[in-house]
């Protein structure tokens, strides 16, 4: 039974639940509980039995529901929320530590990256690969790409591949380009770009599918490396009050590792896995073959692992100016990247055929679409297949959905209402972490359309919040903050080039990383709010999200995380602990 409790009705509802609920084996008391239920109710305490929430109410009422041997967590006035959910995170991909990590704030200029590459090279034999991730030209003092000529200075005898923070482009040194056979005569592959200097010589920067010219040569990580990385990233998520994630683009190897950890009872984060559908009907068909053997959501493995659907690509990156737009990309905000409107990563007609195939199989699909033209194509495709085969509840999504047109917004609103489909899966931290790049590439006429949360809300569109980690840092507190503040990291084009007209309040921002995100994972009956009948996925914070200045939200510290009533993170030194 799902019962929402407001402070005005704690007494009567508490007595009702006492008569109908089993004795609680765990209670949380003396806190401020932000339930994120339909009424946004606030309570003091929570009763839990066998990992399920049985009551929410006042301290007095919840203590009456506790069994004699119940464990008690005194919140000491701290604030509890539902466990936070990331609706788009490359969980397993990011779980493996790269040899060279260059995404942290200590990287100020290209020479800082080169220092780390040089240090890694010193530990390797000549010919061994150096791989890294996380660079972003928008954070460099030089405001330019890293080139092969830069890397050659510190790694003349070792092939190097450094992936951009977006994952949509990267840079190889000359040794890697030589192994890949990339020369000035090499043609751009379909849906890819080999960046070249004014003489036509490759610079080392490879975009979209061109990355595969080098990436396929890099030795894969071992099973043990991937397993250890996954255990580590789950612990890191729990430390940030996070308990569920939608992992896009997995393949059989990744699914098998999830199954392995599930059997060993080592999953401390719920996983909704989207299978990689690629950019062709054959790759989408292969994904469907895997999915056909597994339960469809909301059915799952022990409530912790779901085989959720298929991810496919429509276009590229806003950071790399490869996303498919109606008008030319800008360059440096007021300049023009003349003739460059990006391009579809999947041929548009092939994409439409793929969606027909996936939808026809009764399977959920989420599509990567960043550019306005790409988003229009995606929502029109969803509209077409849903009219041809009306199916409610597959919840087809638009990943990123950065620059939607008015047409796209109206179509999404209608699809959500009529078919429970067409949901944006948004990354508010884009505005912060890679926002300077976006502001420069979109230009002053389009920049305030980025991630239009307030417009979505006004049209009745709900979305799931996410990070796209490792594109941006994964803690959901950053996404909650960015949804409200819309500030960039370095203020290259001003502190708030995206404006504040599309900002939302903290209640909406929190809901996008809890109740609404749970719906994107088909788990809204299990998690996403603190209500009787749901699993006790709960995070406890050092301050009240609803009352602190919004700029403090990115500094939130998690003190305790529960997954089904089990402690999966306890902050050292915190008084909030199981007693």
Regions found by a protein language model. Give the residues of each.
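Divalent metal-binding segments
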Residues: 22-29, 34, 38-292, 299, ...
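Short beta-strand segments in beta-sandwich/barrel cores
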Residues: 32-34, 51-54, 519, 538-539, ...
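Short, charged, surface-exposed secondary-structure boundary motifs
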Residues: 83, 281-285, 434-438, 492, ...
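Acyl-CoA/ACP chain-elongation machinery
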Residues: 402
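Catalytic cores of alpha/beta
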Residues: 407-412
């Amino acid at each position: 039974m799902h019962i929402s409790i407001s402070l005005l009705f704690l007494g009567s509802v508490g007595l009702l639940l006492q008569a109908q609920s089993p004795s609680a084996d765990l209670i949380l008391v003396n806190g401020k509980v932000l339930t994120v239920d339909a009424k946004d109710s606030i309570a003091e305490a929570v009763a839990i039995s066998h990992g399920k929430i049985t009551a929410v109410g006042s301290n007095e009422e919840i203590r009456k529901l506790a069994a004699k041997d119940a464990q008690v967590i005194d919140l000491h006035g701290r604030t509890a929320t539902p466990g936070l959910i990331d609706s788009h995170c490359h969980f397993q991909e990011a779980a493996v530590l790269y040899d060279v990590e260059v995404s942290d704030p200590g990287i100020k200029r290209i020479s800082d990256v080169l220092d780390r590459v040089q240090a890694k090279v010193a530990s390797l034999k000549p010919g061994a690969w150096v791989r890294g991730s996380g660079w972003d030209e928008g954070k460099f003092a030089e405001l330019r790409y890293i080139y092969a000529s830069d890397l050659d200075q510190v790694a003349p005898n070792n092939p190097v591949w450094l992936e951009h923070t977006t994952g949509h482009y990267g840079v190889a040194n000359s040794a890697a380009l030589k192994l890949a056979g990339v020369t000035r005569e090499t043609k751009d592959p379909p849906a890819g770009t080999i960046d070249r200097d004014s003489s036509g010589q490759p610079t080392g920067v490879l975009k979209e599918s061109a990355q595969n010219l080098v990436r396929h040569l890099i030795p894969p990580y071992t099973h043990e490396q991937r397993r250890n990385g996954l255990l580590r990233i789950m612990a890191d998520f729990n430390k940030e009050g996070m308990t569920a994630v939608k992992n896009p683009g997995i393949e059989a190897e990744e699914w098998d590792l999830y199954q392995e950890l599930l059997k060993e009872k080592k999953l401390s984060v719920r996983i909704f896995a989207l299978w990689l559908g690629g950019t062709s009907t054959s790759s989408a068909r292969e994904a469907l073959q895997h999915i056909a053997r597994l339960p469809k959501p909301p059915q799952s493995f022990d409530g912790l692992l779901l085989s959720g659907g298929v991810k496919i690509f429509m276009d590229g990156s806003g950071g790399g100016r490869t996303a498919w737009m109606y008008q030319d990309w800008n360059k440096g905000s007021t300049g023009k990247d003349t003739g460059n409107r990006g391009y579809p990563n999947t041929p548009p007609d092939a994409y439409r055929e793929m969606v027909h195939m996936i939808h026809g199989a009764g399977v959920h699909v989420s599509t990567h679409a960043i550019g306005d033209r790409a988003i229009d194509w995606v929502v029109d495709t969803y509209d077409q297949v849903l009219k041809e085969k009306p199916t409610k509840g597959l919840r087809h999504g638009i990943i990123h959905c950065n620059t939607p047109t008015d047409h796209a917004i109206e179509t999404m609103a209608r699809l959500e209402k009529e078919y429970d489909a067409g949901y944006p899966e948004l990354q508010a931290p884009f505005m912060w972490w890679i926002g300077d790049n976006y502001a420069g590439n979109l230009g002053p006429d389009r920049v305030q359309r980025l991630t239009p949360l307030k417009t979505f809300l006004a049209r009745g569109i709900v979305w799931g919040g996410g990070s796209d980690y490792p594109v941006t840092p994964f803690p959901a507190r950053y996404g909650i903050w960015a949804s409200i503040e819309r500030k960039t990291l370095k203020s290259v084009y001003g502190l708030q080039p995206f404006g504040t007209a599309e900002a939302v309040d903290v209640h909406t921002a929190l809901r996008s990383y809890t109740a609404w995100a749970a719906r994107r994972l088909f788990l809204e009956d299990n998690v996403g709010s603190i209500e009787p009948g749901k699993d006790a996925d709960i995070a406890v914070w050092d301050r009240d999200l609803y009352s602190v200045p919004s700029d403090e939200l990115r500094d939130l510290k998690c003190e305790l995380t529960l997954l089904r009533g089990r402690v999966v993170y306890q902050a050292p030194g915190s008084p909030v602990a199981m007693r």
